[in-house]
Amino acid sequence: MNGRACRILQEGAAELGVEISDELVTLFSLFADELKKWNRKINLTAITGDEEIALKHFVDSLALCRLVSGDDELLDLGSGGGFPVLPLALVFPTMTAVSVDAVEKKIIFQRHAARLLGCRRFEAIHARGEDLPRMLERRFNRIVSRAFSDIPSFARMALPLLMPQGTIIAMKGRGGAEEADAARGALEEMGLTVVRVTEYRLPFSGDARTLVEIGFC
């Protein structure tokens, strides 16, 4: 990444309460370079500029740091090029992080990136979300996604994999709070409820973002 992108990463993360050391900047820069290189061959992301990657992939993913920790067992459903799961795995190296996507080439990239970045507690699985309950015996206390278009569909897929005291976290944009309100009825039918809605602005761009936390009733 260029110098401005590195500054966006560090300063943007700091606005969200996350300290990014110079060592981590080097790792994130390596991640960005690999993402761009692989993206020339396979379609991983439409976001290709250094500054955009730093802000819309890295900083955006790190907004979850306020809701997760290094002790978590985290599952990212529909992770695409590795977001938000790989940035979280870099910041929390002790976190058990599992990434799932239905597109095999994206999972192959994630495995390569994780090896390159030294993410030892990271696993990437090529699967459809609905197939996971019969593939995985384990359960997770944090299940996250920024890929799903609607909250009930995400919650329905995550529910069989959620620990009793765990939370499902949907990363949404503008209108996320209203979407959470509209989903309450469907969630209650699943035995779930909206625990908390956090609205904030993405640093530098000012774009509206919403984190919707969902737990058992």
Swiss-Prot record:
Q: Which InterPro entries match?
A: rRNA_ssu_MeTfrase_G, SAM-dependent_MTases_sf
- The record lists S-adenosyl-L-methionine as bound by G78, F83, G129, E130, R146
Q: Which reaction does it catalyse?
A: guanosine(527) in 16S rRNA + S-adenosyl-L-methionine = N(7)-methylguanosine(527) in 16S rRNA + S-adenosyl-L-homocysteine
Signal peptide feature range: none
Molecular-function GO term, any one: rRNA (guanine-N7-)-methyltransferase activity
Listed GO CC annotations = cytosol
| Compartment(s) of residence | Cytoplasm
**Entry keywords, A to Z:** Cytoplasm, Methyltransferase, rRNA processing, S-adenosyl-L-methionine, Transferase
- Reported EC number(s) for this entry are 2.1.1.170
Annotated SUPFAM superfamilies: S-adenosyl-L-methionine-dependent methyltransferases
Question: Gene3D superfamilies from the xrefs?
Answer: Vaccinia Virus protein VP39 (3.40.50.150)
| Highest rank taxon of the organism | Bacteria
Q: Give the matching Pfam families.
A: GidB
| Protein task | Specifically methylates the N7 position of guanine in position 527 of 16S rRNA.
By sequence similarity, the record places it as follows: Belongs to the methyltransferase superfamily. RNA methyltransferase RsmG family.
Listed name of the protein: Ribosomal RNA small subunit methyltransferase G
